[in-house]
Amino acid sequence: MNLSAVIPTILGIPFDAQSSYLRGAAEAPTKIRQALACDASNHWTETGVDLGAAGIYEDGGDLEFLERDAFAAIENGADEIIRLGKRPVCLGGDHSITYPIVKAVARKYSGLTIFHFDAHPDLYDEFEGNRLSHACPFARIMEAGLAKRLVQVGIRTINRHQREQVQKFGVEVVEMSTLPAYDTLKAAGPIYITFDMDVLDPAFAPGISHREPGGMSVREAIAHLQAIEGEIVGADLVEFNPVRDVDGMTATVAAKILKEILGKMIAG
């Protein structure tokens, strides 16, 4: 599989209706773009990719949809990017958006490996009676057979039910206490990256709804992204909540993570 000509395309998904604690993540796509365009930094990634070069990636803007139609609209939006011969890079929004995105990606790319960076497994069968909560996307993905392999990195809060779900679905969990996890970040087939901003320690990223101390530094996160080996066919960046940010710190970090994901997709 040669993806060198398959351009990464950003798609903003301003949706946070499945958040269980605080809303605000719907405001993130705009804030991330503003931080990415800020003159305080240049467009070069650490892997030597100039994101300012013409045509190296595209931005498809934000999806527009009614809240009740969100999941169908998100799936269709990701599917449209794929049908145009491009790779979706979606900016949430809460983590529930990953399920409809992966539905679209899995139709094109079978045998998908998902590398999931997060403080939480998001494997609840249901949360507060809601099977589509941002606490449940990976249960939906795995029960639907959309991924061959799910690797969760940076987990540091997991209860008995979710450990049972890990066993049920054969999930590979790398808890924060056992990092680094470079050897697990290799796949022979297509790879999808989902990066929840709360994988980072809140000292580095305070602008998140579910702050969980003891997380990754920005440097650790970038090192793990750069350690990924294989063909990346899509990605998302979720759960940045600008309402809780401090002086734009988390927006800047989110833009940095986005830059390095794009750079990794382009450079291979």
Which residues does each PLM region occupy?
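Conserved alpha-helical scaffold segments that buttress catalytic/binding sites
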Residues: 2-268
